[in-house]
Amino acid sequence: HLQTLRFSKNNKRYIDDPSITGDDGLSEPRSILEKIKKSDIKRHHQADKVRKEIEKSPYPVILCGDFNDVPNSYAYTHIGKGLINTFVEKGSGIGNTFSDLASTLRIDNIFSDPRFHVEQYIRIKKRLSDHYPVVADLVY
């Protein structure tokens, strides 16, 4: 689980309706931008650590998790380098995994060593939390 944004209820309300303003009209946008910046820096460092562990592993890697970041992010591309993305192999559509805020975010991932064959990838559209579960069947 990589660093979350930690948006407050007010942050989320503002994102849903930007016409809402704070006392000075700038407090919510500033708060949101600060949280995005701080969490991005933390995810960058976390991604570097995860990548080092992947490279040290003497075994074929399967990596599953909530990246809290989108497919064009540093965390996603750095961690996923040289691995198979099970959604790309067998998923379909947008494949959103996060149900709050923007419903198009795919931030939960399953990556595998290329020696695995991806039989199927499924996103279960059941709201058990603010994320939809994802499942991949892999064959070695």
Residue ranges and their predicted role:
Residues 41-62, 67-140:
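Metal-dependent phosphoester-hydrolase catalytic domains
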